[in-house]
Curated annotation (Swiss-Prot):
This is Ribulose bisphosphate carboxylase large chain. GO terms for biological process: photorespiration; reductive pentose-phosphate cycle. It catalyses: 2 (2R)-3-phosphoglycerate + 2 H(+) = D-ribulose 1,5-bisphosphate + CO2 + H2O; D-ribulose 1,5-bisphosphate + O2 = 2-phosphoglycolate + (2R)-3-phosphoglycerate + 2 H(+). RuBisCO catalyzes two reactions: the carboxylation of D-ribulose 1,5-bisphosphate, the primary event in carbon dioxide fixation, as well as the oxidative fragmentation of the pentose substrate in the photorespiration process. Both reactions occur simultaneously and in competition at the same active site. Gene3D superfamilies: RuBisCO large subunit, N-terminal domain. The basic functional RuBisCO is composed of a large chain homodimer in a 'head-to-tail' conformation. In form I RuBisCO this homodimer is arranged in a barrel-like tetramer with the small subunits forming a tetrameric 'cap' on each end of the 'barrel'. GO terms for cellular component: chloroplast. Belongs to the RuBisCO large chain family. Type I subfamily. It is found in: Plastid, Chloroplast. It comes from the Eukaryota. GO terms for molecular function: monooxygenase activity; ribulose-bisphosphate carboxylase activity. The modification N6,N6,N6-trimethyllysine is found at residue 14. The gene is rbcL. It is an enzyme of class 4 (lyase).
């Protein structure tokens, strides 16, 4: 029989929607030689701000 382990849901991340500007937007980010540029065209649904799409 394998040993039992305890899993805690709060370890690592919290579920839910976070404001984009608080979690991903870094205005003072400096690019590195290893960075890869990827571009996507996104059309927000009605009522969704463009920066949140």
């Amino acid at each position: 029989m394998s040993p039992q382990t305890e899993t805690k849901a709060s370890v690592g991340f919290k579920a839910g929607v976070k404001d984009y500007k608080l979690t991903y937007y870094t205005p003072d980010y400096e690019t590195k030689d290893t960075d890869i540029l990827a571009a996507f065209r996104v059309t927000p649904q009605p009522g969704v701000p463009p920066e949140e799409a």
